A protein has these predicted regions:
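N-terminal, active-site-proximal structural segment of metallo-dependent hydrolase catalytic domains
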Residues: 1-190, 203-210, 215
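Residues that flank catalytic or metal-binding motifs in active/ligand-binding sites
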Residues: 107, 214-217, 244-249
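Short, solvent-exposed coil/turn elements at secondary-structure transition points
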Residues: 117, 203-204, 224, 232-235
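Conserved beta strand-loop-helix elements of the APE1-like EEP
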Residues: 176, 192, 212-229, 251-253
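Eukaryotic non-catalytic protein-interaction modules, chiefly N-terminal intrinsically disordered
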Residues: 194-201
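Active-site catalytic loop in hydrolytic enzyme cores
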Residues: 229-253
């Protein structure tokens, strides 16, 4: 059975959305506070400008964090309970034409994999990356632009020793490190321009699996119909992986 909604019942989905709405400003303010003191390499080249632009906002972030902390703790507790009933993935389908995306009789297909580091801003900065929301949009737009160009241009012969700077035409994309739910939805909206079938928000959350923190970070993007999907959580993890529900996503197309 394919899950197109995160929960089996509508009221559970509504309660989860409300708890996420309450949590979002607290998590955002905390991330912004920590991010001030984690400048990227580009920001370190003009460190005084970085601090002069961001330090004046610190009192605002602290006010939001302190004022909403208690409601956020309650919302987090509610969200943890709801996670026990949540499906292990969401299938998003957006068809432009019912007949256009039938699986073709092809002898081969193209599959790409990519790690995109969609995490909260302060965690992305440990990888020397910033502006995660804008980066999620940019990644999706770049993939789609290259797919459209690949479809429109004639097949050129390969050049020995050539390094491609564009994404090739891809039937399927296996994405990793898409941990942030909001940024993942932004990426999904962009990719739906070409890819009608997308599985995202993959993972099971529990106290002993990931401490209700991050999902698996997996996403599967397909031009052709997804017939079945299943996710199995790894039984053991260590170090920072303890906070993400990593596992194996199995998809049939």
């Amino acid at each position: 059975m394919l899950h197109k909604t995160p929960f089996p019942h509508g009221y559970q989905q509504w309660m989860f959305a409300v708890s996420e709405f309450i949590l979002r400003p607290v998590l955002w303010s905390f991330s912004e506070i920590v991010s001030i003191f984690l400048p990227t390499t580009a920001e370190q080249s003009s460190i005084m400008r970085h601090y002069s632009l961001n330090l004046p906002l610190l009192p605002l972030y602290l006010i939001v964090l302190v004022c909403l902390l208690v409601p956020a703790l309650i919302a987090f507790f509610v969200r943890c309970i709801l996670h026990l009933f949540r499906h292990s993935y969401i299938l998003s389908v957006r068809l432009a034409n019912e007949h256009h995306y039938k699986a073709p009789h092809k002898k081969q297909c193209s599959i790409s994999t990519m790690n995109i580091c969609l995490m909260p801003e302060f965690l992305s900065r440990f990888n020397n990356l910033s502006r995660t929301s804008q980066r999620a949009t940019a990644v999706g737009q770049r993939i789609i632009a290259d797919q459209i160009q690949s479809q429109n241009r004639s097949q050129a012969p390969s050049i020995v020793g050539n390094i491609e700077t564009n994404f090739p035409e891809m039937d399927f994309i296996c994405i990793q490190e898409a941990w942030h739910r909001d940024y993942s939805k932004t990426l999904v909206d962009e990719l739906h321009t070409v890819y009608p079938w997308i599985i995202y928000d993959v993972g099971n959350s529990s106290l002993f699996n990931n401490y209700f923190i991050f999902n698996s970070g997996l996403m599967f993007v397909s031009k052709y119909e997804i017939l079945h999907a299943s996710f199995k959580t790894y039984s053991h993890s260590c170090k920072q992986c303890l906070f993400s529900g990593k596992g194996l996503l199995m998809v049939k197309v």
